[in-house]
Amino acid sequence: MDISPRTRPDLPLPSAAIAEPTRHEPDAGGHFGVYGGRYVAEALMAVIEEVTTAYEKERVNQDFLDTLDYLQANYAGRPSPLYEAPRLSEQAGARIFLKREDLNHTGSHKINNVLGQALLAQRMGKKRVIAETGAGQHGVATATACALLGLECVIYMGAVDTERQALNVARMRLLGATVVSVQSGSKTLKDAINEAFRDWVTNADNTFYCFGTAAGPHPFPAMVRDFQRIIGLEARAQIQAQAGRLPDAVLACIGGGSNAIGIFHPFIDDPGVRLIGFEAAGDGVETGRHAATFSGGSPGAFQGSFSYLLQDEDGQTIESHSISAGLDYPGVGPEHAWLRERVSTTRGWVRNTRGCARFRTLCRTEGIIPAIESAHAVAGALKVAPELGKAAIIVVNLSGRGDKDVETAAQWFGLLGSSDR
């Protein structure tokens, strides 16, 4: 298959991110050290093993890889640019480069993973795809891929999130998806995942669960990471071409962790590169109203794997909170937990107030409206830049665009008046 005029020979293809195992693979049971594994009902074990077998087959199937490369280049718009942000850099006091995943088709990094999983579902003969979504970006990407491939699509979304991300709900429905508003629990992302798992148990014969983040039971953490690694592979080549060296730090926001693991992974073996993830601190970690899993959580089993989560002394999940729907999740992917202990990755946190402030900062310095999730990473960059110094190079993963968050931001900043004069 002809790959496309858009493909740049100096940058890696998406297939390069999945065809060969990395030096940091889970064991046969899906464990990264003590983290990961499969903590699921017996009824799901067979279908999860079916997904594992199919993925291991297709990741070395040249026809699958060529099709993925073709769609990523011609349909999704890869490679995404790496943009040096001059006015943001001036304010930060360091050289800031933005990896523009917001420019992908559907407006975020989510399409990288979804195209891979939807192709896998099609090759497995599944006619129906289900997915969970928080901010709606994964839901939109899944609905998009299903429309492209002619698959039935059902999206589970917490009722709180359907209200604060109404624009993305409309997009999903326009694309032909059925959106199920989940009324249980906190009515956010974790509850949407629970409902999706229940659906999968009931309809496993004809249904594929397109998991949106690098969490859940094996093989999802590794598979989602593989489809997202193209972010970091491109960024690594781009920064060396533009700046002549590797960055001093690579930053990303962290909820479940797919955008972060995607950009971090190709830099893991570079000792001079700091990998820093910024969690959503909500109203402040000390208040208990936050989604900072590492800062305020502890290890435990949650939604299919063993990792860090927000839980009480009895092991019951604590409700998370963030103005960002995509970061409003009380767990994190197991590979992040492992990397936190084994590699030079660190975690910081950003409150709602600072995340929203840096949302506006990026709008007014660079003319880029980011997702509120991504604004947490921008806030992190302005936080660490003084420590690193003016000569430092910082790569920030701008994981998504902020169309979906304009109403939230307008309410936060009081921008809804009829006139400025």
Swiss-Prot record:
The modification N6-(pyridoxal phosphate)lysine is found at K110. Tetramer of two alpha and two beta chains. It is an enzyme of class 4 (lyase). The gene is trpB. The keyword Lipid biosynthesis does not apply. One of its GO terms (cellular component) is cytoplasm. This is Tryptophan synthase beta chain. The lineage of its organism: Bacteria, Bacillati, Actinomycetota, Actinomycetes, Mycobacteriales. It comes from Mycobacterium intracellulare. It comes from the Bacteria. The beta subunit is responsible for the synthesis of L-tryptophan from indole and L-serine.
